[in-house]
């Protein structure tokens, strides 16, 4: 199997954990690589083995992606991984998405590889959002899509109309409108006083940002 590892930039603990995970997956018999910046960091350390580095875009062709850092690192990996399952090693303060502590990283990777080999890997599928117009389309977003005006505050904002399945649901004026996945309910949505939603809920959050009128 092909395993790609991405570590948080500029973090010595992330680089060290990446090396541990690399060696665990390699000893498991897999083809393993790390992101180019982590490979460069390892190459500069005396006594470190030569570890192959690849662009993060190569994650989409992997059987397993490993994100080492905080939620930002996890989301960065998810944007590049396509349908590849992502295992998160948490080095951040919160870690809503990265569930595995560094001390359990190698054991978690070996368990995931065993699950993939046996065809019984337990995964949680997370929805992603795409914004689309006649002229462009966004990359898939794991957290949220936000529509807003040029600036926020008094005298600014947008008039909006919200439709669901081509039927008008609401109109109003606000600084903007945010649509979040359950995963994203813990991010920007929460700072805009939106609700927390359990990851397994089949739905989306629609949140007015500093609304002038209620939905």
Residue ranges of each PLM-predicted region?
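Short glycine/serine/threonine-rich phosphate/pyrophosphate-binding segments
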Residues: 14-15, 72-77, 171, 186-190
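Gly/Ser/Thr-rich active-site loops/lids in small-molecule metabolic enzymes
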Residues: 155-157, 170-214
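Short hydrophobic core segments
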Residues: 65, 145-146, 176-181
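Gly/Ser-rich helix-loop-strand patches that form or flank binding pockets
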Residues: 81-89
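N-terminal glycine-rich "phosphate-gripper" loop used for MgATP/nucleotide binding
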Residues: 63-71, 78-80
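ATP/NTP phosphate-donor binding region
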Residues: 1-64, 104-121, 133-138
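Catalytic core of DAGKc-family lipid kinases
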Residues: 92-175
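Short glycine-rich anion-binding loops that position phosphate/pyrophosphate groups of nucleotides
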Residues: 10, 71-73, 92, 183-185
């Amino acid at each position: 199997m092909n395993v790609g590892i991405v570590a948080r930039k500029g973090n010595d603990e992330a680089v060290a954990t990446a090396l541990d995970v690399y060696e665990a997956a390699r000893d498991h018999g897999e083809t393993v690589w790390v992101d180019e910046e982590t490979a460069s960091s390892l190459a500069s350390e005396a006594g470190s083995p030569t570890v192959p580095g690849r662009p993060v875009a190569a994650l989409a062709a992997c059987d397993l992606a490993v994100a080492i850092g905080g939620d930002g690192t996890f989301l960065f990996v998810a944007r590049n991984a396509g349908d590849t399952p992502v295992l998160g090693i948490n080095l951040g303060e919160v870690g809503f998405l990265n569930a595995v502590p560094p001390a359990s990283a190698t054991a978690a990777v070996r368990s995931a590889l065993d699950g993939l080999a046996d065809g019984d890997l337990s995964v949680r599928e997370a929805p992603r959002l795409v914004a689309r117009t006649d002229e462009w389309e966004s990359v898939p977003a794991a957290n949220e899509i936000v529509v807003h005006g040029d600036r926020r505050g008094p005298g600014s904002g947008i008039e909006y109309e919200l439709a669901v399945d081509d039927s008008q649901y609401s109109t109003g004026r606000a600084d903007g409108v945010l649509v979040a996945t359950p995963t994203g309910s813990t991010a920007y949505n929460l700072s805009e006083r939106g609700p927390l939603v359990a990851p397994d809920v089949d739905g989306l959050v629609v949140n007015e940002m500093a609304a002038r009128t209620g939905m």
